[in-house]
């Protein structure tokens, strides 16, 4: 454990940020998974689920949780499957 006061603060903020990032990334993955299953099953609410997944993917890319190219690839796969 760190002894310096600023290092102790950084450990706390890093742990908070890590928890937030993990939660946001998990929510994004779940939304993408739900959208893909809705599209494959031709569900009634597939358009809503795809738009929610795209929104969460964009937010994850904006906060550098995933690379922007990966975000574009995921969105492209969702849109192609939803045609």
UniProtKB/Swiss-Prot annotation:
Q: Which Pfam families match?
A: Ribosomal_S20p
Keyword annotations from UniProtKB, A to Z: Ribonucleoprotein, Ribosomal protein, RNA-binding, rRNA-binding
Which GO CC annotations does the UniProt entry carry?
A: cytosol; small ribosomal subunit
According to the UniProt entry, its GO molecular function terms are: small ribosomal subunit rRNA binding; structural constituent of ribosome
| InterPro entries to which the protein is assigned, alphabetical | Ribosomal_bS20, Ribosomal_bS20_sf
What GO terms in the biological process aspect are recorded for it?
translation
Give the top-rank taxon of the lineage listed in the UniProt record for this protein: Bacteria
Q: Which residues form a coiled coil?
A: none
Gene3D superfamilies annotated for this entry?
Ribosomal protein S20
Residues making up the signal peptide according to the UniProt record: none
Name the protein family. Belongs to the bacterial ribosomal protein bS20 family.
Q: What does this protein do?
A: Binds directly to 16S ribosomal RNA.
User: What is the designated name of this protein?
Assistant: Small ribosomal subunit protein bS20
